[in-house]
Amino acid sequence: MDLLPRVGIGTDVHRLVDGVPLHLAGLHWPDEPQGLEGHSDADVAAHAACDALFSAAGLGDLGSNFGTADPAWAGASGAALLEETARRVRAAGFEIGNVAVQVIGNRPRLGGRRAEAETALSAAVGAPVSVSATTADGLGLTGRGEGVAAIATALVTPRHHGSA
């Protein structure tokens, strides 16, 4: 196995709906009037991080690992998916360097809870996770407030097993 670091990218987007609690970046947002619709808790930040980690390790993507046809993951938290993703990446022979996640949406405003989100996601991954946020200036589904998206990158390095 090549010992050079590998980078992966992941994205996720979910629609905002009434009557669903909002889970985003490993946190519950009890004051938000809408939540994200999905098979699991629809935490787009955690899901994008999972996709980035799977991509970097060459292990497929979120859907091929935790598909909607598998009832075991119905309602699962983003943190649980991220913990299992990190376990699978490490089991495949990789160390996780870091993950960077950018959330795109009008709500919630992440600034006041950024450190808390980074702590929650880092704990799930077992490696540093940074979180940033932006809006889409009124453009597209995130700009119109119809949903929230996230983009993530991950750095993994193959573990060296003995000398050549």
From Swiss-Prot:
<protein>
    <recommendedName>
        <fullName>2-C-methyl-D-erythritol 2,4-cyclodiphosphate synthase</fullName>
        <ecNumber>4.6.1.12</ecNumber>
    </recommendedName>
</protein>
<feature type="binding site">
    <location>
        <position position="47"/>
    </location>
    <ligand>
        <name>a divalent metal cation</name>
    </ligand>
</feature>
<feature type="binding site">
    <location>
        <position position="12"/>
    </location>
    <ligand>
        <name>a divalent metal cation</name>
    </ligand>
</feature>
<feature type="binding site">
    <location>
        <begin position="61"/>
        <end position="63"/>
    </location>
    <ligand>
        <name>4-CDP-2-C-methyl-D-erythritol 2-phosphate</name>
    </ligand>
</feature>
<dbReference type="InterPro" id="IPR020555">
    <property type="entry name" value="MECDP_synthase_CS"/>
</dbReference>
<comment type="subunit">
    <text>Homotrimer.</text>
</comment>
<comment type="similarity">
    <text>Belongs to the IspF family.</text>
</comment>
<feature type="site" description="Transition state stabilizer">
    <location>
        <position position="39"/>
    </location>
</feature>
<dbReference type="InterPro" id="IPR003526">
    <property type="entry name" value="MECDP_synthase"/>
</dbReference>
<keyword id="KW-0479">Metal-binding</keyword>
<feature type="binding site">
    <location>
        <begin position="134"/>
        <end position="137"/>
    </location>
    <ligand>
        <name>4-CDP-2-C-methyl-D-erythritol 2-phosphate</name>
    </ligand>
</feature>
<dbReference type="Pfam" id="PF02542">
    <property type="entry name" value="YgbB"/>
</dbReference>
<keyword id="KW-0414">Isoprene biosynthesis</keyword>
<feature type="binding site">
    <location>
        <position position="14"/>
    </location>
    <ligand>
        <name>a divalent metal cation</name>
    </ligand>
</feature>
<feature type="binding site">
    <location>
        <begin position="12"/>
        <end position="14"/>
    </location>
    <ligand>
        <name>4-CDP-2-C-methyl-D-erythritol 2-phosphate</name>
    </ligand>
</feature>
<dbReference type="GO" id="GO:0046872">
    <property type="term" value="F:metal ion binding"/>
</dbReference>
<dbReference type="GO" id="GO:0008685">
    <property type="term" value="F:2-C-methyl-D-erythritol 2,4-cyclodiphosphate synthase activity"/>
</dbReference>
<dbReference type="GO" id="GO:0016114">
    <property type="term" value="P:terpenoid biosynthetic process"/>
</dbReference>
<feature type="site" description="Transition state stabilizer">
    <location>
        <position position="135"/>
    </location>
</feature>
<dbReference type="InterPro" id="IPR036571">
    <property type="entry name" value="MECDP_synthase_sf"/>
</dbReference>
<comment type="function">
    <text>Involved in the biosynthesis of isopentenyl diphosphate (IPP) and dimethylallyl diphosphate (DMAPP), two major building blocks of isoprenoid compounds. Catalyzes the conversion of 4-diphosphocytidyl-2-C-methyl-D-erythritol 2-phosphate (CDP-ME2P) to 2-C-methyl-D-erythritol 2,4-cyclodiphosphate (ME-CPP) with a corresponding release of cytidine 5-monophosphate (CMP).</text>
</comment>
<keyword id="KW-0456">Lyase</keyword>
<comment type="pathway">
    <text>Isoprenoid biosynthesis; isopentenyl diphosphate biosynthesis via DXP pathway; isopentenyl diphosphate from 1-deoxy-D-xylulose 5-phosphate: step 4/6.</text>
</comment>
<dbReference type="GO" id="GO:0019288">
    <property type="term" value="P:isopentenyl diphosphate biosynthetic process, methylerythritol 4-phosphate pathway"/>
</dbReference>
<feature type="binding site">
    <location>
        <begin position="39"/>
        <end position="40"/>
    </location>
    <ligand>
        <name>4-CDP-2-C-methyl-D-erythritol 2-phosphate</name>
    </ligand>
</feature>
<feature type="binding site">
    <location>
        <position position="144"/>
    </location>
    <ligand>
        <name>4-CDP-2-C-methyl-D-erythritol 2-phosphate</name>
    </ligand>
</feature>
